[in-house]
Swiss-Prot record:
Keywords: Activator, Host nucleus, Host-virus interaction, Late protein, Repressor, Transcription, Transcription regulation, Viral genome packaging, Viral release from host cell. It comes from the Viruses. It holds the Pfam family Adeno_L433K_22K. Residues 1-124 are annotated as: Disordered. Part of a genome packaging complex composed of packaging proteins 1, 2 and 3; this complex specifically binds to the packaging sequence on the left end of viral genomic DNA and performs packaging of the viral genome. Self-assembles into higher-order structures. It is found in: Host nucleus. Induction: Expressed at the late phase of the viral replicative cycle. Probably already expressed from the early to late transition. InterPro entries: Adeno_L4-33K/L4-22K. The lineage of its organism: Viruses, Varidnaviria, Bamfordvirae, Preplasmiviricota, Tectiliviricetes. It comes from Human adenovirus C serotype 2 (HAdV-2). This is Packaging protein 2.
Length: 195
């Protein structure tokens, strides 16, 4: 028998992967350079604004950004990592939901009516909120701080601590001095009859 010759396929033409990778790297570097130029131009603009705010003299001439761009173009060999973008402005913390009143920074000069309201007022009746106060105090076990925050959040009214203490004392089963039923006369008559 005649020896069979193995059919050998010619090797595939070499792909220019190296050229492909180089072209991708060049594209990435071009994009990075453009981004850096954009950041540089933003930095220069912000610096120019800061300088113009500090010294308003019109005789100060700013250098043109074109020569600086040529000097700031990094070479491929020296660039190891892209520069981080400039820091964002510091955000103020969100206002807590349980804080009340106006902050000093909101308005420079409050309206005259608000100045009058800031003064101490006389007696105010909390009777309209009695049911909400008593129910909240009973549900939270007489915790004044929690009841204050809860009522402020859900009813939008900042109840004074002394009012909550008063209603806890009168209507709460957790305090010994309170009647627990809401009626002052029934608790005192039972104490007199037994004692």
């Amino acid at each position: 028998m005649a020896p069979k010759k193995k059919l050998q396929l010619p090797p595939p033409p070499p792909t220019d992967e190296e050229e492909y990778w180089d072209s991708q790297a060049e594209e990435v570097l071009d994009e990075e350079e453009e981004m850096m130029e954009d950041w540089d131009s933003l930095d220069e603009a912000s610096e120019a604004e800061e300088v113009s705010d500090e010294t308003p003299s019109p005789s100060v001439a700013f250098p043109s950004p074109a020569p600086q761009k040529l000097a700031t173009v990094p070479s491929i060999a020296t660039t190891s990592a892209p520069q981080a973008p400039p820091a964002l402005p510091v955000r103020r913390p969100n206002r807590r939901w349980d804080t009340t009143g106006t902050r000093a920074g909101k308005s420079k000069q409050p309206p005259p009516l608000a100045q009058e309201q800031q003064q101490r007022q006389g007696y105010r009746s909390w009777r309209g909120h009695k049911n909400a106060i008593v129910a909240c105090l009973q549900d939270c076990g007489g915790n004044i701080s929690f009841a204050r925050r809860f009522l402020l959040y859900h009813h939008g009214v900042a109840f004074p601590r002394n009012i909550l203490h008063y209603y806890r004392h009168l209507y709460s089963p957790y305090c010994t001095g309170g009647s627990g039923s809401g009626s002052n006369s029934s608790g005192h008559t039972e104490a007199k009859a037994t004692g």
